[in-house]
């Protein structure tokens, strides 16, 4: 494998259909394209060039359209009568829409079935035991790579997952035993003689590829080779094909950095728990495979299909792949979604379509959310398009940091410290997830980190140490993903009565009760009465200075007195904590605050939900709290999505997009929106 050293890039102006021609080597497939180069050539913006894609790269032309961007690496350049033409070579890769950074796990899903990729976007990873145990095993894997004692690592990581395990009703000893069984494969493999003192390990390694349009976090790198951990079993000699795809995608990104990757390893940890008398085949957990050029090309072509579909804003049907629906564990879900949204699907469809207005609502917001995703990808692109000073001037990075040291801290993580220049400012905030690097966040060594202090000194925590010389805003698709899930849950899972109100088919209903909750302000008292008597929803509007926060606190107390469990939420941590402060000022303390140490105000940390510890105690604290407070973003987490409330009270509602608000409203039977539409509107990144 060779390093990518040259490329042609530009906007497609015309795309011909693939065809077959006779050459001196026999029949070959090709496709002709017309491109306006944007870099990689000496031509200016008015010049167009012809590009020939040979062999399997011609298949990419079937997915390309005028207006898309294209990259051809290592092209052959010919000139005839003043005309410059380009064509692919044996070393070439062809990349469609390289600015759309496809996550490696998305390609894995796409290769299994494009329809599965789509379904995974709509429905978030649920809170279930295999997912939680898998996370624990992965964390133990990282600990063992750093030389930590196995028993200590297992005990610590199981305790770390205490809340989730408690919500699932799991016993600590049982979980530790199962994790130990999986970890035996890791420990045994690390003890093999194939590993030497010269082996350099990195775990959870962040990779970004501007050339291939890829991003992801490799489970581990050993001497630059990707190692992927799977908590399931595989008794075949070869790794599963979709697992090879995942490792090969990391190899491509490493190749772009000049790392010569020719081998990948898949570690199936459940194999060590199998009994030879019960299972046949190859029970060895570690399965290595060779990274051939054909496999790497297949990864890029698959990625191109996905990126092209997203560029066309289409929904996959499943016919794009050879997957057999009858063997798919998502078949039933696929058929239900297809039936309800009236979509074409290889698996077929069941059920009646939802009303046209609901389907139109879903499609409109689906496209709006995906536009937001593309805006996030534009921010990724700035990581390599903008220079150091340009990013600093744009407040997107802190540069010129002076490293002050690093130390290992609790949880087998690292604390990094650096001094920042006196005049340095940025959009970074304490609690943010950012990208810490030695100076080049894309081609150099970089680690995802969480900012814990941001004053004269910068303090961050990471999984692995790095010399902290630069800190960049790291774009995240988490909010986009959670908005999609909220949209899916509202349209496809909400009961018809709730949707009748949301879509205006029925007026909200109210009881006739009347009490005095606030005796010195009739407007506030009327607002509390309205909300308490709401059978469906209520809107409370109040300009600045009208006492909305005080009213919210009194409303929550009244709802709890009625026996309701209440979700208090808002777009920002600041708004949530301000409402909590007002509630506590009124003497109410039976509160559970969901969030991180860096996100929650210091004087509210005493009511923070502790996620670490005894599973039953952690789960009981959350379940038994009559008032749970969290941001709307946190409402989309897998823990919060398992909770149910009688009423959701949403402060500063005007700052929320509809899908962001739905993440909270989906958790409650009734809701109250509080805010002022004349104040701050929702924050969005997409221009549309």
What are these language model-derived features?
Residues 1-27, 331-441:
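Accessory interdomain/linker segments of ATP-dependent helicases and helicase-like nucleic-acid enzymes
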Residues 1-68, 75-90, 98-101, 211, ...:
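Single-stranded nucleic-acid-binding OB-fold domains
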Residues 29, 38-66, 200-304, 425-426:
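Mg2+/Mn2+-dependent nuclease catalytic core
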Residues 59-218, 245:
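Metal-dependent nuclease catalytic cores that hydrolyze phosphodiester bonds in DNA/RNA
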Residues 111-117, 302-351:
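Cysteine-cluster motifs in flexible loop/terminal segments that predominantly coordinate metals
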Residues 272-289, 293, 298-306, 430-520, ...:
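Pre-ATPase regulatory/linker segments immediately N-terminal to the P-loop/RecA-like helicase/translocase core
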Residues 465-628:
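ASCE P-loop NTPase motor cores of helicases and related translocases
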Residues 562-564, 570-574, 586, 618-619, ...:
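Conserved helicase motor core of SF1/SF2 NTP-dependent helicases
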